[in-house]
């Protein structure tokens, strides 16, 4: 996979599992957080939602941690035009976590078969 301006390009054609894992921490009174996978078959002229997940949190001022995942199967028939990108949305005051030693917030691509 290569990435440019947040858009991921596949290294070869094929059927892929695309997974988006998000870990975060609420720092205030945010009530929800969401993650989404978008895909295009026309090099970004239009984008379709491939997977969406939302997590709700108890509306208290204390810190709260959350994890969510969304996954989709994507048929990449042309590496020049078929791409994916990722999006996160939060009401307010959410810190997304990352780590160099383990996958906390990450994208996972698995080639499953030929197209």
Q: Where are the regions that the model predicts?
A:
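Extracellular jelly-roll beta-sandwich "head" domains, especially the C-terminal globular C1q domain
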Residues: 1-115
């Amino acid at each position: 996979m290569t990435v440019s301006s947040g858009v991921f390009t596949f290294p070869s054609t094929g059927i892929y599992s695309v997974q988006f894992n998000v870990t975060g921490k609420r720092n205030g009174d945010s009530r929800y957080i969401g993650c989404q996978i978008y895909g295009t078959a026309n090099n970004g002229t239009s984008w379709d939602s491939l997977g969406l997940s939302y997590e709700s949190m108890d509306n208290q001022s204390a810190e709260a941690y959350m994890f969510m995942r969304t996954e989709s199967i994507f048929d990449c028939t042309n590496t020049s035009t078929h791409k994916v990108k990722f999006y996160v949305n939060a009401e307010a005051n959410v810190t997304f976590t990352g780590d160099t030693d383990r996958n906390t917030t990450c994208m996972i691509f698995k080639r499953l078969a030929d197209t």
